[in-house]
Amino acid sequence: MTTVNLAAYRFVSLDSIEQWRPLITARCNALGLRGTILLAPEGINLFIAGSRGATDAFVDYLRHDPLFEGKFADLPFKESLSDSQPFRRMLVRLKREIITMKKPAIKPELGRAPSVDARMLKAWLDRGHDDAGRPVVMLDTRNAFEVDVGTFDNALDYRIDKFSQFPGVIEANRADLEGKTVVSFCTGGIRCEKAAIHMKDVGIENVYQLEGGILKYFEEVGGAHYHGDCFVFDYRTALNPQLAPTADVTCFACRAVVPADAQQSPLYVPGKSCPACHPGDQGRRADHRADPAHAA
């Protein structure tokens, strides 16, 4: 049976998350859903999967139940399909931030940086400049191991290990962005939204966020100006520009991404180890977990 995978986030002030947590958990369990929902005073970030009927029912619940006071009435969801359930369990977690930047003064609900949609961005990249004639710089806000799976052509990648490092690398590399149109991007939009707001706050001009992130770009225009796949924080590991799971897997031991060619190595033992587990190996290794707390 086909599994429906949903992702969504919203920055909005929430003051009842402690009361909501058991109620949302009970509803998800009753519907047979699995995944992770993060609740914080600044908003919601969720990745869930289940049957079509279950996911539709949950969307209706979030958008229309009086419990949520209309805060999610028009919450957009990104959808993809898989042949199996990518999550092992259902978790509803309370967090300080739905994506950790350690910049509590940022309040995206009070005003976002401008956004550019997939079709407009493709037009800019086709031409090599934006509508004002400025060169366009793609800025990857994701962790280094995610970038290694795939990214936009010629994107700036500052090899961060966690999103809270982003403000520091921007301060150190401001010259890369001056006089250009900067488009921040990430998997689903949440990190590039916070990143764009931060850049505007520190005085960097002509900053945009990619609306809906890489996954929305794939959905609308495919893989134009992009090379590789997109890492996702679940057991699918990566999606190609057609939003289909790839042959990449995540190593059970070290959590590195193991592409198809590395799976042919004698050092790869499914469920036990991979080439990156061994000292001296030069393959990709990352200290990460398949945890949406790091994502989108």
Swiss-Prot record:
GO biological process, one term: tRNA modification
Catalytic activity, EC: 1.14.-.-
Transmembrane segments: none
Keyword Plastid: no
Keyword match DNA damage: no
Catalytic machinery residues: 186
CDD domains registered for this protein in UniProt: RHOD_YceA (cd01518)
Catalytic reactions of this protein: uridine(34) in tRNA + AH2 + O2 = 5-hydroxyuridine(34) in tRNA + A + H2O
Residue ranges of every copy of the Rhodanese domain listed in the record: 132-226
SUPFAM superfamilies: Rhodanese/Cell cycle control phosphatase
Gene Ontology MF, one: oxidoreductase activity, acting on paired donors, with incorporation or reduction of molecular oxygen
Pfam families per UniProt: Rhodanese, UPF0176_N
Sorted UniProt keywords: Oxidoreductase, tRNA processing
Purpose: Catalyzes oxygen-dependent 5-hydroxyuridine (ho5U) modification at position 34 in tRNAs.
Similarity comment: family membership: Belongs to the TrhO family.
HAMAP family per UniProt: TrhO (MF_00469)
Name listed for the protein in its UniProt record: tRNA uridine(34) hydroxylase
Gene this chain is encoded by: trhO
